[in-house]
Amino acid sequence: MLRVSAVFILLLPLFFTPVSTYGGTLSIVSQSRWVEVGRVLDGDTFVGNMGEHIRLLGINTPEIAHEASPAQPMGDEATQALTKLIAGKSVRLDFDKQRKDDYGRTLAQLYLRDGTWVNGEMVRLGMAHVYTFTPNLRWAAPLTLLEAGARQRQTGIWSTERFSMLDADDVASGNLGQFRVVQGRVGEIARDGFSFRMGHLKVSIPRKYRRYFGHSRVAHKGDRVVIHGVVRASSSGLYIALHSPSDVEKIAP
């Protein structure tokens, strides 16, 4: 069981209360617009009534069934949760640096007219995990806090074997291609500070993302950290690449 820091205790009420309080502080109204929800496709995507495909930015939900691929655990429940939140309603779209993804979908944070922050609420409910990518980092910090609360409560996806936190020593070839949350202690660190070991698992920051991490080391030897990323393999073994500062969290010893 992870030890809970004093900061986490102070923020605990946020994890049990619908996240409406973030609406006014994180949005830039001049860059916002309203759309009517037409059809919810899955837990993180919907179609507006004018045919626009909109992807909830900064989060990812389990996959629903697609042709030969079965649904992931909680995939249908995540779709139902988003449907309950936004179906038949007007939602405000707030934007970060990039407004479109490679599939042409609009990337946005969603807010209801009552101020509810939909992306944050999906994370708080345990129906989504944080999935940030540079340069879209404006909402990364509060999303990460909400995910930590959901993990601590083991609610939603965090109650399933597929999404539960792994210890670094337990990451195996069976996890290849999976987005996982992994905890462990930092071991050997590369001289440049952009890669380190957690047991047999290598953690690295690809060159093109390093400028987003600043000049200080991401972690120090002996630190206990939680990392987020896709498990991959190279000639030197299993590794996870970090793409944004929110992909690594320091936790109490």
Regions found by a protein language model. Name each.
Residues L2-P253:
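Small beta-barrel nucleic-acid-binding modules, primarily SNase/OB-fold domains
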